[in-house]
């Protein structure tokens, strides 16, 4: 459900920028636009990974890491928009104190999530096996491409 609303928000925002604001394009690779796009990419990979996890029992660790990554990128987007760290037409505040609180929350949530994952990862191991040419292999490749796309967006946004 969250992915549907994020998709709708990105689509409506792009349409609004194109038709109402007359910016002449749907997407400008603004850091705040990227902050919504990166969790969307990982969320898309997560949905595909969940399908395989539920059906075949595979990709369990991958699914957990995608969930942690998508939520972490959502928090990072909040930090980027509200802290004043980046310059953007979408940046809403330049209060460094607020940014520190959001950064602390970001570090705590990511740190605790990865710690819990590290503690329970051995229990997640296993799952089904599948051939080199199979639906699961295709979905794994798809997840890899979406993750690389999200990482590229993150690098471009922060660089």
Q: For each predicted feature, which ranges?
A:
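Hydrophobic cores of alpha-helical transmembrane segments in multi-pass inner/ER membrane proteins
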Residues: 35-50, 101-121, 146-151
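A conserved hydrophobic secondary-structure block that centers on an alpha-helix together
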Residues: 1-14
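Membrane-interface interhelical loops and short amphipathic "cap" helices
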Residues: 11-35, 56, 80-102, 127-133, ...
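Aromatic-anchored segments of alpha-helical transmembrane domains
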Residues: 9-10, 69-78
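Acidic/polar loop patches that form or flank catalytic/metal-binding clefts of enzymes
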Residues: 48-62, 86-88, 115-119, 123-128
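Membrane-interfacial loop-to-helix junctions in multi-pass inner-membrane proteins
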Residues: 1-3, 52-68, 96-100, 129-141
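Specific lipid-exposed transmembrane alpha-helices and their immediate membrane-water interface residues
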Residues: 77-90, 109-124, 145-159
